[in-house]
Amino acid sequence: MDTSHPQQPDALAVGHATGTPGLAQQLPSIVIERRVEWPDTDAAGHYHHSTVVRWAEAAEAALLRRLGLAHLFGSTPRVRFEADYRARLWFGERVRTELRVTRVGTSSLHYAFTVHGEGEAAAAVGRMVVVHSAARATGSTPWPDGVRDVLTQAGPQPPELLA
């Protein structure tokens, strides 16, 4: 699986690797809103750590749908997920998850995410890496050109907000 180092020459990353001005504005991102639901909480009454994984993946799903890349589901396994938990979120609280593409490698896609509750402070921050693996492939496969173009040029997408 391709989880190569960010200085890989064919990688596009925020702020370096290509020298292209404005590259950070070209990489896709999205903000989604959800509520902390009853099954999201633990015995202490605040959100369970595993809920952040679902919120990050829900943001990824919304982003890929917006980009017309829903067909990638099933061919982009996660190879890394990490999160730092900074604040509690409580049942019923509105939660905003921002997911940003930070790097597009030959076959990898790196995301960063931030989860906010109703306050300004981040409740969780983290990153996730997926790789492209075509059907029946035994490992990672390069992004098709059309997919790579979208992943490197689509820019911020409209938010998916609660009504």
Residue ranges and their predicted role:
Residues A61-L109, A123-V125, V130-V131:
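Hydrophobic beta-strand-centered segment that forms part of the acyl-chain substrate-binding groove
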Residues A121-A122, S140:
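Beta-sandwich strand segments
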